[in-house]
Amino acid sequence: MTKNLYLGVMSGTSLDGVDLCVMDFAKNPPKLTACGFTPMPEDLRTDLSHLLKSGETSLQKLGEIDHRLGLLYAESIKRFLAEHQLSASDIQAIGCHGQTVWHSPNGNFPFTMQIGDMNLVAAHTGITTIADFRRKDMAVGGQGAPLVPAFHEGIFASPERLTVVLNIGGISNISVLAPQQPTIGYDVSVGNALMDSWIELHQAKRYDKNAEWAKTGTLIPALLDSLLDEPFFKLPAPKSTGRELFNLEWLVKKSANLTTYRPEDVQRTLAEFTVQSVVNELKTLESEKQCLLLACGGGARNPLLMQRFSELLPKWQVATTDEYGLDIDYVEAAAFAWLAYQRVHNLTNNLPSVTGAKEPVSLGVIYPK
């Protein structure tokens, strides 16, 4: 059978590295055939982290980071293809998200900024590259995020149940796939970002593997209540957020007593905050039908988070996308392969019911090989 391969490339707000996957669109539903990961070089991660936390840089520095990211994507793709015995001619197109450094969908001049020079990606790989997926949605009145729910709808929706796909990356976002209703999707809360930043600050680790540190801590109810008292949670959907809100500066503002707590107790509380802020939203969606929560993203590998979701959602079946045929670490990368496929065929790939856009459009800028 003829293959129809597209390569999805994603680097998220966690800054851990680059996810890559190949999707075969000759299959129905499309099939994930290969996946891989390239760690973010430490010097680039440091520069990006500073940029995300401060929001300040020089034009020269921004241009250099843009170039370095383009090279990272290109080299990651070439290495990935070689490892999987694939050539550039096997791939119809690359869908590359780029690296979000700012997302501000409200105000007088809404904008989103993803960097990483896609001219370099197309030139160095010899593969047509599709990128800049968010700004056209914003141009027609949308939030520019999230983009993945349309992909989730095609893969996971069922007329027999309410399905919510929860992606726990740096930020937690959901796709709500309800029978006979338009799909909706939006950011609901922080994901791993605060937990990752806190353990990096106190233990110089990138993340809390298997929640080992959080499990040694004790919940701080007063801090949890303060964190949950965040105006973002009261905003109507669709809505989007990022590290420009949920960061260590925000955490400090939320608690005058932060330095008096044991760091591991704060970590345990941040984990609980991640779960409870999501659960509060899910409980507003519960229906009489079967309810399925499908978790993906790095947070789906956190046993403490998954345990607490199961405990706090007794009416729901709680599972990961692994159990439904899509590796939890590569759902977003797979979605960008799908977005590229849709763009190449000039098909719409945003959902106005999700982003708030005035109309469905075909997102993505094409960078020819």
From Swiss-Prot:
Pathway, per record: Amino-sugar metabolism; 1,6-anhydro-N-acetylmuramate degradation; Cell wall biogenesis; peptidoglycan recycling
Keyword hit for Kinase: yes
Catalytic activity line of the entry: 1,6-anhydro-N-acetyl-beta-muramate + ATP + H2O = N-acetyl-D-muramate 6-phosphate + ADP + H(+)
Stored Pfam families: AnmK
Molecular function via GO: ATP binding; kinase activity; phosphotransferase activity, alcohol group as acceptor
Keyword terms of this UniProt record: ATP-binding, Carbohydrate metabolism, Kinase, Nucleotide-binding, Transferase
Chain positions recorded as ATP binding sites: 12-19
Gene Ontology biological-process annotations: 1,6-anhydro-N-acetyl-beta-muramic acid catabolic process; amino sugar metabolic process; peptidoglycan turnover
Enzyme Commission code: 2.7.1.170
Membership in a protein family: Belongs to the anhydro-N-acetylmuramic acid kinase family.
NCBIfam families: PRK09585.1-3
Role, per record: Catalyzes the specific phosphorylation of 1,6-anhydro-N-acetylmuramic acid (anhMurNAc) with the simultaneous cleavage of the 1,6-anhydro ring, generating MurNAc-6-P. Is required for the utilization of anhMurNAc either imported from the medium or derived from its own cell wall murein, and thus plays a role in cell wall recycling.
Record protein name field: Anhydro-N-acetylmuramic acid kinase
Originating species: Actinobacillus pleuropneumoniae serotype 3 (strain JL03)
